[in-house]
Amino acid sequence: MSQSVVVNPRPALKAKLTKEPFSIPNLKPYYKAWPTAVNPDYPGLKVALEARIKNLYPPKKAAKLIQDDYALLSSMWWPRATADRLQTCTFWFLWLFTWDDEIDQSTSDLFIHIHKANDFRKESLEYVKFCLGVGDDETAKWDFQNNPPNRPLIRSLDVIGAHLQKVYNHDQIMTFVNEIDYYMGCQQREQKRKLTGRLPIVAEYLETRMGTSAVTSMLALNEFADGNDIPRDIMTDPKMISLWYEVNMNMSLSNDLLSLRKEIKHGDIDSMVPVLVSARGLTVRQAVKETEAEINRNIERFDQIADALLEEIKLTHPEKVDEVASYIVGCRYNQMANFLWSLTTTRYGLGDMVRDAEGRIPIVIENVN
């Protein structure tokens, strides 16, 4: 009895993506008059972050991380934060990007061996809980007090946790922890799928993408960064949850577009455009156009939900209107920072690329070395 052979569809899809030139669209007009700013403490933060990077990572990796300029991303993300809180949030950014790269790169040992990745995720999550003072019986099994993690990357969470504990209440801390748990769980499901070689349908892709983006963990830091203390019934209001969803969708899709050249080049093709090409039979240009249109709709939805939320708060918590309005502005800063930094960072390699008259970036993957 002959056995059927499962063919990995990814090489054929990568070949298709490589053959068709496309352009990364100019998304700036969709954001209208959304605010942008750079935190005045950016120069000092850059120095502090460079020192931390050199202390945590080997020289070659450190040089690349310094070049990517995560201090600029953080300074645009939280332009109103005080210097000490901005530094803590930036150290979280650094941890998040480097932690994700440990597993997400298809050639890494942790990606290839999922049991090792699962252990890495488990130790990381339990150490997060330990550092934030919300450890449970599972955390106690690790005895981190006497046996800290061997990996400097995981261990570096201690500074972040200590500062958050001084500012956040238990509910705020648990929101942050739960979003990290959500992120790691989605990443695990995505890794399992990638290892099978199977390509997801659009709904399946989005189900994990909204977690692997890690956006909600960063949204959970906004109150810390900007000095807010918003009642939990507001933060769990359906409109606030919808607002978070739209922020997450915006960053996920815009990152999918802006990193597309890099992802195709490296064969990591689990993003919205390749999924649309695979699942719906679109051309690359059609898939890019559909993703662009959804980002436009997403921005419109965000503004509508923000207005509706403020109208509700005027009735239910009139004393909190200004604080919630400030939080919404912070979400706009977050999205603009993500977008503008992605256009210029060396991480995606778009900064020096030629734009056409409409601000689009023509891409020919075959010409990428």
UniProtKB/Swiss-Prot annotation:
UniProt keyword list: Lyase, Magnesium, Metal-binding
Residues the entry annotates as binding Mg(2+) 1: D100
Protein name, entry field: Sesquiterpene cyclase hepA
SS bond list: none
Induction: The expression is positively regulated by the 2 cluster-specific transcription factors hepR and hepS.
GO biological process: isoprenoid biosynthetic process
Entry similarity comment: Belongs to the terpene synthase family.
Enzyme class per UniProt: lyase
Cofactor: Mg(2+)
Cofactor binding, per record: Binds 3 Mg(2+) ions per subunit.
Binding site residues for Mg(2+) 3: N248, S252, D256
Native source species: Aspergillus oryzae (strain ATCC 42149 / RIB 40) (Yellow koji mold)
Binding positions for Mg(2+) 2 per the UniProt entry: D100
Pfam families documented for this protein: Terpene_syn_C_2
Entry text on domains: The DDXX(D,E) motif is important for the catalytic activity, presumably through binding to Mg(2+). The conserved (N,D)D(L,I,V)X(S,T)XXXE motif is characteristic to type I terpene cyclases that form an allylic cation through the release of the pyrophosphate group.
Observed effect of gene inactivation: Abolishes the production of heptelidic acid.
One Gene Ontology molecular-function label: terpene synthase activity
